[in-house]
Amino acid sequence: REVILNKDFTEMGYMTELLLYASARAQLVKENIKPALDAGQAVIADRFVDSSAVYQGIGRGLGVDTVYKVNEFALQGIMPDMTFLMDLDAQEGISRKKNQAELDRMENEKLEFHQKVVDGYRMLADMHPERIVKIDATLPIDEIHGIITEYVEKKLNL
């Protein structure tokens, strides 16, 4: 991920970007996710294949189906049971990020790209309501925490 997000690699091809993310994901599955699942543990990840479906598939125009096909081998059949989409307007998301830290290569993209990404996430949430929970990211953080906690407790029968 460090190479992929390096802002100095501005000429990286979109397919290269997709393949590098799939490779990083394959290693994550091998080293962390699969062993944890095999041990009966719950796994929480901040991003997974849906991010590539949106960023590379929609934002870069490679196609959502292409992204899922490329990642199929890397994921070894593992897909998230639940995804939380922090739904936020693209401009607001950029503004928040600029106030936090130095932007990486993806974060430095134009507003048009980020709008495609937001629209893509919303489309995926509409396509997969059984596993993607859309949360209004303008809500106070305590409310967001409560919503997520409620869904996780219900999913894990806690």
Name every feature range the model reports, one short phrase each.
Residues 1-75:
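ATP-dependent small-molecule kinase phosphotransfer cores
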Residues 15, 79-80, 129:
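A structure-centric signal for secondary-structure junctions around beta-strands
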Residues 18-20, 37, 62, 85-88, ...:
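Generic leucine side-chain signal with a strong bias for well-ordered alpha-helical environments
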Residues 44, 82-84, 133-135:
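Hydrophobic/aromatic beta-strand patches that form the interior of the parallel beta-sheet core
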Residues 47, 51-119:
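A glycine- and Lys/Arg-enriched "phosphate-lid" helix/loop adjacent to the NTP-binding pocket
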Residues 91-158:
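NTP-dependent small-molecule kinase module
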